[in-house]
Amino acid sequence: MEPQVTLNVTFKNETQSFLVSDPENTTWADVEAMVKVSFDLNTIQIKYLDEENEEISINSQGEYEEALKMANIKQGNQLQMQVHEGYHVVDEALPKNVVENQAAARTGKKPLAHYSSLVRVLGSDMKTTEEPAPEQCSSAPCDTDQPQDKPPDWFTSYLEMFREQVVKETVEKLEQRLQEKLVLQKPLLSSSPTEVSMPISEETLFLPENQFSWHIACSHCQKRIVGVRYQCSLCPSYNICEDCEAGPYTHDTNHVLLKLRRPVVISSEPFFYSKYSAPRLPAALEQVRLQKQVDKNFVKAEKQRLRAEKKQRKAEVKELKKQLKLHRKIHLWNSIHGLQSPKSPLGRPESLLQSNTLMLPLQPCAPVMPTLSAAFVDENLPDGTHLQPGTKFIKHWRMKNTGNVKWNTDTKLKFMWGNLTLASTEKKDVLVPCLKAGHVGVVSVEFIAPTLEGTYTSHWRLSHKGQQFGPRVWCSIIVDPFPSSESPDNVEGDRISSSKADDFSCEQEEAFLLAEEEIPLGEVTKQTEGTGASASQKTRRAASERELYIPSVDLLTAQDLLSFELLDINIVQELERVPHNTPVDMTPCMSPLPHDSPLIEKPGLGQIQEESEGAGFKAPPDSTVSAKRKAETPASVEETEEDLSGTQFVCETVIRSLTLDAAPDHNPPCRQRSPQRELQLYSTEGQQPLVLPGFCRKDSSLKFALPEEGPRGDEREEIVHIVEEEVVEEEEEVQDEEVQSQSSASSEDYIIILPECFDTSRPLGDSMYSSALSQPGLERGAEGEPGIESGLEPTEARERLPERESQPQEQSISDILTTSQPLDTVPLVPEVAGLPAALSRSAPCGQCESSGVDSPGVDSPATMHEVPPAPDDIRGEPRGSTGLANSRQRSCDHSRHHNGSSIAGGLVKGALSVAASAYKALFSGPPVTAQPIVSEDQTTALMAHLFEMGFCDRQLNLRLLRKHNYNILQVVTELLQVNNNDWYSHRY
């Protein structure tokens, strides 16, 4: 069943809707009857609108069915219909042709063939349904005088327009056909030139000779043009005949002549040849047509030209944008082939816009900014070269200028850090050869091998007016031990020279450089270019200077060195093997370590201390402790012979990351035993010592170097000593050899450079950071003048322990940290918690203060220095032995029972603690203090810290605080273990 269709019928702005079904149930006669009744009409003409909004008449059942199908398919069951009042139903007595003519006259369209039969059917239906209407219609004569018989105005106007159009088209068609026949029948006749001005009648207008007669005189021969005519496209008044065009004629040869065979008759205008002069009409029409054609061609050509110019302009703009984008990202380029001299003005991207020619993509772009860059090519002394003590040597680095700025006297090789002694201490930077861009030269530095055996390095980097650039280069050597056949005099002489080298300040000698001749690029076999960029290294100069772009190669920031992978002890062995002066993209984060000489003695304090600090300490003139040293015998050297452990590597990495901005230290390693019983501290004027708890043992002496907090030139100095606990000279004399063997075999020395976030204005016990591996300690009364021996018997130290402290003897430490302060400070007695059972690498409460690694043994002195960056302001203490066990200290009985595995475990924990503490200090801000809490306010503060960290079980937190003697580090560790166990049990 077909869907129903809604008929929207409109008659004189009145619309009614009819709902019809399929054509079988509702026929066209029914629809027409409904429309007549609805609008009270007698005779109607119904039209519907198709999909193109064209009116189509409906006069039969077939047309009605087609309209319904169209409405179902294309118009959504909607059919728009228009009703026009008319007379298509007439009396049957009239002839059939009369009815058809009347219908055609009223509708304006030719009736269909079946219209007569339809009229009969509809007429009979209308007579049966509406009897009065047919009678009235039949009785009324078809007279146009009556008002009801007069057609509507729109119909009358339409017929008038239609009549005019038909007449005009008919006349034009007849004229065209007549002209064609005349042309084909009669030949062309010649005419005289005098006929140009003769009037032409209508009869002679269509003659063949006049058809091709232009009634225009030839501009060359002055004859009337008959036949083909040539007209200039630029000069409308210049016309020549076909004969003159074939021969020579006087006209501009650049002008194009248009060939015209016959005039074109415009059908829209009737030809009234009697009213117009015959010669002018065709010429004027042809001229207009030609002018329009010329204008059209010109406009078309102009549009094409403009379109081509627009396309070319777009291509130019696109290319310029591409080049500007490349200039903005010039820091990603390794080098620029378009070189620019230093004195030339700075190239700007705006200069590219001044070019009118389209730049090809392969054309090299001018550099946007002068770039400073360098690449390491070769060296003369590879890493790990063995040298004898005191040997003078010159280290050469072959460097290539990969930038576009020539190196001048402002370009120098600047010292960064290291412990290798220079030949002169006057300057810490050396001149480099004035290399042009792309050339290779030799940079040289003169060194002196230290007198003590060990591994020594010195790191350097190129600098231009204070801005560093290029890769970092270094010199790494291994100093062999003294031969056993050396006399004591030679040893003593080397000891004195080493002692002098220990007192060097950070000033280096400006060595002479051996500049090489300019080497072409093709001869360079090794080349490494920097690819990174650092916007922070751009410096603004004066108006006469330019802004130089310096690509960063090795920034050596603490964030880079303290990444998460450095905290993983599993990768330590992989990082121990470091190539010799590797290229830029493989530059290690630390000094090269020896891996090709297994018989080298463990560097210990020597390498770590010298590479970490990088600048020596000058001894005060009022020092009363002499820097006397003893050279070790070959037997003691063999006892302490070890490879550099992974723990030392991690510690050294962390240490260097924290001391990058601090002044370097140049003290050579000191591995000799000191006969002194203690180290004496000389503080500045007006400073009072403060006693603080110690947390380091003998075998791992610590040296803390704090960055300067005050302004440059601050003379304040904070030195912390950890001195021995028990001193009994008689017992030490008896056990001297025993301590020697133990300390030389198990001692490892560390220097921890405290970060800037460490609070040096307060004593170490009051600081907001605490050690992650600290031990319970006691205060010792050591306030007094410097140089006075301060110590307590072990029994006194144990008596002063709190009652709740019941730690084993091997975890007990009662060292003394003596801090010099500018004001008198009341001694504090803080307690340091015991060593945690296990330290997780992911502990959330890392501590910032770096501590020493717990090793069984007797206490050893450690010194804390505050290092100003200026070499002139650096002060220190004379130290005769740094990092070795004091031969006069007492050894505990239990220390003999610990093997090397326990020491290694302690070292691993210490290294991880140092790394985690430094990482948390740099990235996590000030952590929670780990001081034991006794008061209720302090307990509340610790509970609040635990709440902030996410541990909200108050009873569990309080119980664990009491269990661990208010050591928040151990509390957090156990809470994390509990949470992990709970998660694991619920997860699995």
Curated annotation (Swiss-Prot):
Pfam families: N_BRCA1_IG (PF16158), PB1 (PF00564), UBA_NBR1_C (PF24932), ZZ (PF00569). Disruption phenotype: NBR1-conditional knockout mice are not affected concerning general autophagy. However, the deletion results in a slight but significant reduction on the number and size of SQSTM1 liquid droplets. Residues 4-86 form the PB1 domain. Ubiquitin-binding autophagy adapter that participates in different processes including host defense or intracellular homeostasis. Possesses a double function during the selective autophagy by acting as a shuttle bringing ubiquitinated proteins to autophagosomes and also by participating in the formation of protein aggregates. Plays a role in the regulation of the innate immune response by modulating type I interferon production and targeting ubiquitinated IRF3 for autophagic degradation. Residues 543-637, 745-756 are annotated as: ATG8 family proteins-binding. Homooligomer and heterooligomer. Interacts with TRIM55. Interacts with titin/TTN. Interacts with RNF29, USP8, MAP1LC3A, MAP1LC3B, MAP1LC3C, GABARAP, GABARAPL1 and GABARAPL2. Binds to ubiquitin and ubiquitinated proteins. Interacts with SQSTM1. Interacts with TAX1BP1. Interacts with IRF3; this interaction mediates autophagic degradation of IRF3. Interacts with IL12A and IL12B. SMART domains: PB1, ZnF_ZZ. Zn(2+) 1 binds at C218, C221, C241, C244. The keyword Transit peptide does not apply. GO terms for cellular component: autophagosome; cytosol; late endosome; lysosome; M band; mitochondrial intermembrane space; nuclear body; peroxisomal membrane. A zinc finger (ZZ-type) spans 213-265. Expressed in brain. Residues 935-979 form the UBA domain. It is found in: Cytoplasm; Cytoplasmic vesicle, Autophagosome; Lysosome; Cytoplasm, Myofibril, Sarcomere, M line. GO terms for molecular function: mitogen-activated protein kinase binding; ubiquitin binding; zinc ion binding. Zn(2+) 2 binds at C232, C235, H251, H255. Phosphorylated by GSK3A; this phosphorylation inhibits NBR1 involvement in the formation of ubiquitinated protein aggregates. It comes from Mus musculus (Mouse). This is Next to BRCA1 gene 1 protein. The modification Phosphothreonine is found at T587. Its main location: cytoplasm.
